[in-house]
Amino acid sequence: MKYRFGLPKKIVFGAAATFLLSFASAQTVSEGIINLDSHKYAKAKEIFNQMIAKSPTAENYYYLGYSYLSQFEPNFELAKENFDKGLAIDSKSYLNKIGLATIKLGKGQKASAIAELTQVAKESKEKDAEVLYRIGEALTMFENNNDPALAITYINKAIEKAQKYGVPAYYYYTLGDAYRLTRDPGNAMTAYDRASEVAKNKASVFYRMATLWMAAKQYKKAEENIVKAINTDATYAPAYKAQAQYNKIFQRHEETTQSLINYTKYADEDPSTALEIAKLYFINSDFAESKATLDKVFDKVNDPIKFKLRAYLQYNENDFTNAKTNLETYYAKVEQSRIIPSDAGLEAVIYAGLASKEADAA
């Protein structure tokens, strides 16, 4: 993942108490961001909510809103709610303006979102590294709605601005992610190498390198970096997710299941994470585990994807009638931009199953 927290740029001599308070707050932000990177979304939200309870600043509301965008399936409604609260406190808050533009990007309103992000850059006069970074990051967050070339421009500007205080590893992670989106693995790996020079937890770097090697079908190097990530920090959940994906490629069913068990163990029990785990179990044909995991959080998540997953599971059980009902509910609730071609494929096989049952009954 790709995150950044700001530290005070100017500290007035003699304001020791203010400095200590700001430092403690920054440390807390850092802790929250580390949890986001580790796929511990519930813990991160808990931290950001605690920050708001102590100090309801525009920045703190931004981080909470951002956590809802960072989870596997973004919750745009709750993200917007927090960005709006941040802007109510400070109408000029660049971060919360970026947050709202990011929501538009996620919903497919690309031209409008980029125009708003560009306006924020203009208003800030491109003086703040964090603002530049967040704009660049926003342009990489959504698979089908992004602008990696523009992201690279903004992130490089952020890196240049941050040199004086030290460039955070998160900047380089995101730069690498942007290069990956442009299908430039060489520069992506270079960015990850630069991240490894400053990262406190190198497991995060090895994980990203592993997924990059996997995408390039360099499986030996992918495996080496997965092992490095786990050996560096055995509690770093994303490494086990990468390991599960690696084992799945080689059709190692039992090993994939064990990797998913470990991922579940070290990620937290945030409902959005559990929904992701249910999907991973389904992909691995662990249908019983997928159903059990989905059932535990079905009423706790608002993401319409839950209806589609349940439809898949019911289709697998030849329960075509309920599968049809859940798929129809999914269509009724989901953003149109999230509907993918395979959804029509599921619909077709469900109707084929219903037709077959009717024929048998006749």
Question: Positions of the model-derived regions?
Answer:
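Bacterial N-terminal signal peptides that target proteins for export
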Residues: 2-15
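Alpha-solenoid helical repeat scaffolds
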Residues: 15, 19-362
